[in-house]
Amino acid sequence: MSEQANSSGIESLSNGLRERNAQASKPIGDGEVTSQSLEDKLQVEEGDAADAEKKTFGRTPDGKVFTVPPTRDMVSQLLSPSEPKNISDIFVLAILGCHILLLWCLPSSFRIAAFAVIFLFWRASYNIGIGWLLHMQSNGRTLVCWAKKSNIFVNPSTGQNPHPTLYKMLKWELETKISEQYSFDEAPTEYNTWLVFRRVVDLILMCDFTSYCLFAIACGGRPAGESFIMLALRWTTGMSLVLFNLWVKLDAHRVVKDFAWYWGDFFYLIDQELTFDGVFEMAPHPMYSVGYAGYYGISLMAASYKVLFISILAHAAQFAFLVLVENPHIEKTYNVPPPRKRVAVDTDTKLQEDENSHEGSVVSDIANSAPVMPALQPVSMHNLLGLHNIDLYRSTDQSVLLAQLLFFALTTVTPSTPVYQFCFVLNAALWRIWYSVGIGYILNRQSNCKMWTRHFVKYGESNHEAWRQWKGTYHLSMTMTYASFIAAAWKMYSFPQDWGYGLVLLRHILGASLIALQIWTSTSIYESLGEFGWFFGDFFFDQSPKLTYSGIYRFLNNPERVLGLAGVWGAVLITSTKSLVFLALLSHTLTLAFIQLVERPHMQKLYGQSLRRDAGLVRSLKRSLPPSLKQIHGSVDKILDESFEFIEEFIEAARPKLATGVQTFVKDTSALFQKYPARVTISRLEPDLAGYDLKDYSITLEGTQPSQPTQFERASDKEGERARSMQFRRGEQENLIFEYGAPIKVKWTAPLNHSKKDWIGLYMVTDNTSREVTSVASQGRWIATNQASFDSETCEQGLISSDIVLKITREDCEPIDVASGEMVFSGDKLWWTQGVFEFRYHHNGKHNVMAVSRPFEIRIGRFDEDIVEADNYGLVRAAVEAALLPVVQNCFDRDPEIAPQTAEEHYGCLVERDGKYSKRVVFAVQHMFGIEFAPEVVRADGNVRNLAWRICNAKKVLAPYSMSRSNGASTPTTEHED
């Protein structure tokens, strides 16, 4: 079920909470609102003020506003005797009864396997079945399309509903359940579809939980030799987890109501502000994280590893459901980029470059025309963290990889004798001391007197160079610290001889879980802070103090204080050695000291009173504590503060000696040193093709032609003498060449009786060897010829008109009437590469080809440097901007919200969120200018002007290695060398 609560304006995405308000629920469709507006609806209801306050108003994607009737929760509907029961309730209860009866009837030897299969079936129905339905509904409104196509919610008296019995049953079912403020005939199709979807969800969720409990009962037992104290402790802990799980579910339902519980925003949105409190202040995704604590409580009470393993599997499947289904929908629905601010630019003064000839270095050529970048915070284009950011051309990555290989080699080739174990533990301890004390000292000095930055400024470097070197130092220190700890843990670990002995298996499971928790915590911290915050950027760059709490920081002030070291204690559980306990205690103590002595003073100095005292989890716990425990909490805080104050005073007194030693050490040390997706071949022959004349089918194309020089790029000096000149062609013989990324209009004709499920797809010419049957999937690059013909609205995007009667004359001079239509392929329905393509008209939803368009070519023309004076930098850059702007607009789908209208206008926010746009641009730049950029460069530059400057700069730097003709000086000859 959907576990997202609703926020009133605080970071809706980073913590998984859906921010639902009036602004977020605007119509998604492009058409105008055909129903009465929300204001009109409110005016109708304002006669009864007390009543109106209790009402919730929903809004469908096409803008229709309706009153959302109150509904009851699933358990009350099914199990409460006071609630009216209908056929679906009786059916669900009967299925649950069959599960319980099956447990009683099956023999004990077969019971565990049977209920394991039953539970996995219902769990797959939940995560895969419901997940697929919600995914299709989110992307193509498939469930609503099914309902509209079948007309099951249309009154049979209109003659449009072919299922009157089903209509009567659904009407009785839903109106029995919702007796207040609900009319089956007046409710929107989206709402009725959601109600039917709810009944399916009720069945799956109830059977999922029931089968899990029955599986636990089948596996339950008492371990041999277990003492009464362990039995009581096991059941007490298990029941506590189950009760906590129950509270999480109830509190979550109190906050999100049935609307979010049953994924209502996949169907419609509500117009109201909703609160953010309770369990949603305690943990991110509480329904999917702490909301599964009961599974582990039941596993503990059952004392069965089988129940524990199947609980872990179910929990992992639930997280996959969250990542693959819910999060993309949340991003699309509630995290819509804000409208871009338009900036009026004076076209007469937008280019004010120095037009003097460039006789000096590259830096002097471009100094006056460099783009204005924000100086407060460095733009991150080449990140360090993550496997996908590894760059073997970068010295930091080379050092890190070589060090890891060295550690791996030493760990594997050396024996695990006490001497080597001591050396590895000592090495891990020294690295941890350096990582906390050494790095902490550098950051403390940087915070107080900019020591690190001053060192680089002394040698003429900039603060950005100091920042770059600091990131490398910190990254290397961090990786070495954890590599040394892992090596020490490996040396101290001994493979268990008997996994069933004692708590060996449980220790490994808990240890692996703690390691996974630390990995997730570190990932969440990085997603919240970014590269700048991860490397303590506010110690190096003074920016306006604006502190925001997003992601994991909404729940914890310092997640690294506990959760950030969970993996260290996980290694302790797995190895069960005193040496690892020592390393874990040392790591935890030094981390707490680092936070208290380095981070906290700097944060107080930088942000002052804007620092938050208590995080969401602490606030929730304090509200639930009795007054006596609150007083104890205050006393503990006072003791800790006094202890850290004593440590600070001690370090302050010893600082001169420490500084002298560190400076000497630094001086002495510095003196020494990317798919191819699987193609599904589908060949479905239609038996009734004999009734159609292929001459009545046709496809014609209209698109944006590229510039004239691009048309003649085929001709070069590589051919024979007779082939160097291009033939003059026109009309049907003219080569069709369209711009990269430009929309293509397709006009089609078909017989008047053509199938309403016909469709047109875009393919590479070389993809299909047959002209009669298409053998490869279109991968989403297709549009239906008629509306409401398929169970998705995605295939209708780009459809302009259909079934317009047109009189044409055949080749045999016979005039006939045909159906015609138009559609536009753009954005994701295009191929974002160069090549030769064709459109294919297909019959009746199958892959039988009725018509094929003329082949056309998508080509990116190379920038002609000969058209401008290479010595005039201003003219070159202006020409690059002029050539680049339309290409960037095409790459951004010509969307006015993200595509710039001028070279100075910044890109829309969606470019930073969706990497496909920047990847399109770098592909085009590489083919236009012969320069390969990373996608991060496009996002960092922010507009065409800055990107053009970067291209010109790169062309100058790479001029000696250019493979194209240049007006500049050539390589020096022997005569010049002499």
Swiss-Prot record:
GO molecular function: phosphatidylethanolamine N-methyltransferase activity
InterPro entries associated with the record: Phopholipid_MeTrfase, Phosphatid-EA_MeTrfase_fun
Protein's cellular compartments: Endoplasmic reticulum membrane
Positions with biased composition (Basic and acidic residues): 714-724
One GO term describing the cellular component: endoplasmic reticulum membrane
Record has Endoplasmic reticulum as a keyword: yes
A Pfam family this chain is assigned to: PEMT
Annotated PROSITE patterns: SAM_CHO2
Record-level GO BP terms: methylation; phosphatidylcholine biosynthetic process
Similarity field: Belongs to the class VI-like SAM-binding methyltransferase superfamily. CHO2 family.
Annotated protein name in UniProt: Phosphatidylethanolamine N-methyltransferase
Classification of source organism: Eukaryota, Fungi, Dikarya, Ascomycota, Pezizomycotina
Gene behind the chain: CHO2
